[in-house]
UniProtKB/Swiss-Prot annotation:
The gene is grpE. It comes from Rhodopseudomonas palustris (strain TIE-1). Residues 1-11 have a biased composition (Basic and acidic residues). The lineage of its organism: Bacteria, Pseudomonadati, Pseudomonadota, Alphaproteobacteria, Hyphomicrobiales. This is Protein GrpE. Keywords: Chaperone, Cytoplasm, Stress response. Residues 1-39 are annotated as: Disordered. It is found in: Cytoplasm.
Length: 207
C-alpha cells in the first residue's frame, strides 16, 4: 500500500466517524425515585411521626412530674419545721386545759387577760400553720381510723359503738393530704359493733 493510499484510508475513517451520530447514556439524577422508594419514604415518614409523638409524650410526662415535684415542694417543704412548731401548740393547749372552767368564770381581770392572751396566741399559731397547709383535726365521736389516729387505751362505754373515739389525748395534724402527726385517742369498747365506714377515711373535725 502506498503512502497515498494510507492517507486515503485514514481520511475515509475520519469522515465515517464524523458522520456517525454520537449516542450517550441517559443521565439519571441522583434523587430520581427508584423502584420501591415510595414505600421507603412512607415508612420513614411514619417512623419520624412515631418518634415525634413519643418525644412529645415524654415531654408532657416530664412537665407533669416537674409540676408535681414543685407542688409537693411547696406543700411539704415546711414539714420538718411544722412538726417542731406542734410542740408549741401543744404547750399552749395544755396551759389552757390546766385552768378549770370554774376558775375561768371567776377569774380576776389579770388572770382573765392572761388566759385570753394564751387563747389568742394559740389561734394565731394555728392560723399561721393552716396558711402553710397544716391543719389540726379532732376525731372525737368518729370511728377509729388507724391511718389518722393512734389508740392509747380503751374506755368501757356501751352508749356508743365499739371502736368510736371517745377521748382525744392529743390532737392530730395533717399537711396537704398526708398525716403530719396522728391524733392520740381513747377508743370505746363494750358497745355495739361500729358500722363499716363507706369510702374514704375520716380525720374528724378540722379546725
Amino acid at each position: 500500500m502506498t503512502e497515498t493510499d494510507g492517507q486515503k484510508d485514514n481520511n475515509q475513517d475520519t469522515a465515517q466517524a464524523a458522520a456517525d451520530p454520537v449516542v450517550s447514556k441517559p443521565y439519571i439524577m441522583p434523587d430520581d425515585p427508584e423502584e420501591g422508594s415510595n414505600e421507603a419514604l412512607v415508612r420513614e415518614a411514619a417512623d419520624a411521626r412515631d418518634k415525634m409523638l413519643r418525644t412529645l409524650a415524654e415531654m408532657e410526662n416530664l412537665r407533669k412530674r416537674t409540676q408535681k415535684e414543685v407542688a409537693d415542694a411547696r406543700t411539704y417543704g415546711v414539714t420538718s419545721f411544722a412538726r417542731d412548731v406542734l410542740d408549741i401548740a401543744d404547750n399552749l393547749q395544755r396551759a389552757l386545759d390546766a385552768v378549770p372552767a370554774e376558775a375561768r368564770a371567776n377569774a380576776e381581770p389579770g388572770l382573765k387577760a392572761l388566759i385570753e392572751g394564751v387563747e389568742l396566741t394559740e389561734r394565731s399559731l394555728l392560723n399561721a400553720l393552716e396558711k402553710n397547709g397544716v391543719k389540726k383535726f379532732d376525731p372525737k365521736g368518729q370511728k377509729f381510723d388507724p391511718n389518722f389516729q393512734q389508740a392509747m387505751y380503751e374506755v368501757p362505754d356501751p352508749s356508743v359503738p365499739a371502736g368510736t373515739v371517745v377521748q382525744v389525748v392529743q390532737a392530730g395534724f395533717t399537711i396537704g393530704d398526708r398525716v403530719l402527726r396522728p391524733a392520740l385517742v381513747g377508743v370505746a369498747k363494750g358497745g355495739a359493733k361500729a358500722a363499716p365506714s363507706d369510702g374514704g377515711s375520716e380525720t374528724g373535725n378540722l379546725n
